[in-house]
């Protein structure tokens, strides 16, 4: 099984709205969930010239799942409660190679 990082990207939401449906999704994907992850707040960036910026990519949080391939991940996240919030919410998926 391959591991995939899910990055949640979208406008801020009320905590109740953004977490609705997550327990059911966790139950549905079962052992495919490697790490529930966490919300992400107060980001900043360090640039190559040593300067710091408070402007970053808007990321709401992350999770890690495992699947055979990209199609398997798409099956896992097709009904993810985050994307069901609306078209302005996206999940970016990246394969995380094992060491």
Named regions from a protein language model:
Residues 1-99:
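Conserved, structured core segments of small domains
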